[in-house]
Amino acid sequence: MHVLSPSPGDCIFIPACTIHALGAGLVVAEIQQASDCTFRLYDWDRVDASGSSRPLHIEQALEVIDYDRGPVDPIRTESIGADRIETLVQCDKFRLMRLSKPESYELDLSTCNVIAVPQGTATLETAHGQIELGMGDSA
């Protein structure tokens, strides 16, 4: 087992078929390809809205786990000043970028974009006006 103690702002890319769990006290943005498939090995004794235990998928998970995958670690990026644009993850399903106080950035509108604001504020300018986003907002 590989245990991490993440710090605020860390990015950790966990490829599909990698067993993982979150510890107490974490707030995360889980970014992934669109999928209706999650195999739970354990569910911390949580229950659904009706009070029933959620199903576990042990046999299915054991069939797809990548047993050769090594430990994952936070992605370390080089700080290039206050205004920076970093590609944190680039895989065949999505790209994750971190924009830190850029004066402006034009989105590629030929693909789906999600803007999340983990701290501070952001202003989106569109043909229809401006949208103000605050900490915790996404669009």
Task: Indicate residue ranges for each PLM-predicted region.
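Glycine- and acidic-residue-biased ligand/ion/polar-headgroup-sensing regions
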Residues: 1, 25, 100-129
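Short, glycine-/Ser/Thr-/acidic-enriched flexible segments
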Residues: 19, 36, 104, 119-122, ...
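C-terminal amphipathic alpha-helical segment
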Residues: 39-109
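Short acidic-glycine-tyrosine-enriched beta hairpin
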Residues: 2-12, 126-139
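Conserved active-site beta-strand-loop modules that form the wall/rim of enzyme catalytic pockets
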Residues: 11, 18-20, 26-30, 85-86, ...
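A generic structural signal for well-ordered coil/turn residues at beta-strand boundaries
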Residues: 8, 16, 25, 90-95, ...
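Ligand-binding loop in jelly-roll beta-barrel domains
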Residues: 17-38, 130, 134
